[in-house]
A protein has these predicted regions:
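Conserved NAD(P)H cofactor-binding loop of Rossmann-fold oxidoreductase domains
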Residues: 78-84
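N-terminal Rossmann NAD(P)H-binding glycine-rich loop of SDR-like oxidoreductase domains
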Residues: 15, 19, 23
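Rossmann-fold cofactor-recognition segment
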Residues: 46-59
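Active-site helix of classical SDR
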Residues: 110, 144
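Residue(s) in the substrate-gating loop at a strand-loop-helix junction
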Residues: 130
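C-terminal helical subdomain
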Residues: 168, 176, 180-219
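Substrate-binding pocket helix/loop in short-chain dehydrogenase/reductase
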Residues: 86-87, 94-96
Length: 239
């Protein structure tokens, strides 16, 4: 388990809906400092918040951020973008762009900050995933989150010897700028972040932060046909 009280927290994608909540609630829970990392850092009105330039798609930027924020004990790997769909016809450059941010960018942050966390006692690395890690329907976004989920599982084992708590945070649609154009039920970002921090402090390694993530995880062992009824039974076409 990792306590947020007394921690030094780094949040990537700190300018977005979830990012702002991660910053605010870390301070509410007693974090002594929060690095608010973003490609174009914004100003904050709290001296405990340190704006930090970090472009997750730029290796030099990630390395410099890890050097500058060397006292970090909790990393919230939150930066992400939406993606094109369907994946069968989207431009490859667009798909690669999503993978660069959501997978390779998040992995770069994890790799460069792992030694920082080790030096500071282990701490926690939290990868913000999605129900899209487990289900299709969101094109390149689903593919990128599935890749990061797999990497999270590997990182959990690889960083265990240095006592780093590696957490996969899963959530469904959340009311953020990324989902502004979608007319679907959305969870309040404040609820997601509260559940995330509570899970971290409880020592959880996988956090299902809302109803949709809990429901999707529960049915993963079902057949492909059960999870995707729109497919029907392809064998019927052969009879």
């Amino acid at each position: 388990m990792t306590n947020i009280s007394g921690a030094v927290v780094l949040v990537t994608g700190a300018n977005g809906g979830l990012g702002v909540e991660f910053v605010a609630q870390a301070l509410e829970r007693g974090a002594t400092k929060v690095y608010a990392a973003a490609r174009t850092p914004r100003s904050w009105d709290d001296e405990r918040i340190v704006p930090l330039r970090l472009d997750v798609t730029d290796a030099a930027s990630v390395a410099e951020a890890a050097k500058h924020a060397g006292d970090t004990t909790v990393v919230i790997n939150n930066a992400g973008v939406g993606g094109p769909e369907p994946i069968s016809s989207a431009e490859f450059d667009d798909i690669r762009s999503v993978m660069e941010t959501n997978f390779f960018g998040a992995l770069a942050v994890a790799r460069d900050f792992a030694p920082v966390l080790a030096r500071n006692g282990g701490g926690a690395l939290v990868n913000v995933l999605s129900v899209a890690s487990w289900i299709a329907g969101m094109g390149a976004y689903s593919a990128s989150k599935a890749a990061l989920w797999s990497a999270t599982n590997s990182l959990r084992l690889e960083l265990a010897p240095q006592k780093t708590q590696v957490v996969g945070l899963h959530l469904g649609y959340t009311d953020t700028p990324m989902t502004a154009g979608l007319t679907v039920p959305k969870e309040d970002p404040a609820v997601i972040v509260r559940n995330a921090y509570e899970g971290i402090e409880a020592g959880q390694l996988e956090i299902l932060a809302d109803g949709p993530s809990q429901q999707v995880k529960a049915r993963l062992s079902a057949s492909v046909e059960a999870n995707y009824p729109q497919l029907g039974n392809p064998l019927n076409d052969l009879q």
